[in-house]
């Protein structure tokens, strides 16, 4: 097993970080942006304090347990990974497309960017030279290439500041995944990765639902849970699969509660792609285990719960309205959006319009519906923003995940390895289906896209362990 070593004196490394932090703080105080002394600033400070407190607690527990260096780095990296997953929910806001295009961002947006910088600082404290050498080895190179492409293309988008900020988050997420790739050595490490993702999606699913129920203007908006119903259905469906996977591994009965909560939120949100993907992915989770009775039980439970929700909430009015307006034929206007954006794609087919240029489709593309926000398809999202280069890299990531998981599923019958491969496959199908109708991948470094990129690392590790076990049995 490879170990990570320190190539420079610790005092020099830490001193450089302190000097950099001091310089950035001085520049920030000199600029005196209006949000500096607002409530958002205190939120950033508070969240940063929580992050470093968690890192301290995890580090202290590792010393007491006598863990090896690789596991220590992995646990610390997963804390930062979790913090990055939930950052959008901590700094929740809704900025109209026109305001973003004009460069008018909310204080919460600046706060979230500052929080990413805090997470990056935490990562810098863990960086070791040998870990960075793996950035362009194996499957990691596809992650690194996509992140670098987005970073390079960001200045060419209609709003470079917006695109650069999100490219920075994507770059940070890839750095964390490279560190995870360098430190994941067994099935327990992969399970730890999914525990980190689980607690992230708990926040991403439960907090928006609670926010909707305390919303003074009403719990429902046009028949669906108030907020971002498409995103919420996706996150809740992902939570269900993660809870089922971890419960299968560890038999934690309380995880069943999160399955129920996740399924309820998934249906109440009314995101049609999210509901279909959630039902299909859980069904696949049981089918791959040949648990046909569980398949029928799951489908029956969804049918009963869905019926209760339709009777007890205004959700039925949303589906009735959807049918009356004949939106099924255009997938809620998506096909019309794709047709309208296609000429723009052909203008720059190789390099695209710049990372996250699709955020402003309604401002640039004639025929795009208002507040489109993205291409509503992950592959078209990459094609519009980063051209064929970005699309090829994204397709390569998908193909490698499928190839790795297929090999892991066909490998030796180690129970936990099989469950992790089955769970990873179900999560992938959930994200894949959603991404056909939303920008689940290929665009912003949101939690679902981060999880998809993480599946590339996990699937490669599962395949490597499968190949190793297969070699030992011959």
Residues covered by each model-derived region:
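Hydrophobic transmembrane alpha-helices and their immediate junctions
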Residues: 11-13, 182, 296-297, 388-429, ...
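A membrane-periplasm/extracellular boundary helix in multi-pass inner-membrane enzymes
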Residues: 27-39, 206-215, 264, 268-269, ...
